[in-house]
Amino acid sequence: MHAIARFSIPLGQASEFRAQLATLQSVLAQAPGFIDGVFGQNLDDPTLWHLSTNWENVGSYRRALSSTRAKLEAIPILARAIDEPGAYE
């Protein structure tokens, strides 16, 4: 299962947001079922960012987001994501 979150972030917030994405990836990486993940800034439009993660199954992804640590550290960052479907087979 692949989860993709895209973000539109003003250029002035880019370095801070990169650090936030690193924290987010670190939080998710500790969850059972996490396989791997990457994040990056779009080359053509530097205000666009993505976080892509791979999971054993959709249940492990959903459980990761419902953990206390995720609610405190990850969800506030994910709340900034562009509102669009992000779960893929």
Regions found by a protein language model. Name each.
Residues 23-36, 54-88:
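An amphipathic, aromatic/His-enriched active-site/gating alpha helix that lines ligand/cofactor pockets
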Residues 8-19:
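Short, surface-exposed ligand-recognition loops at beta-strand->loop->(often short) alpha-helix junctions
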Residues 2-8, 38-65:
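Short, well-ordered beta-strand segments in beta-rich or mixed alpha/beta enzyme
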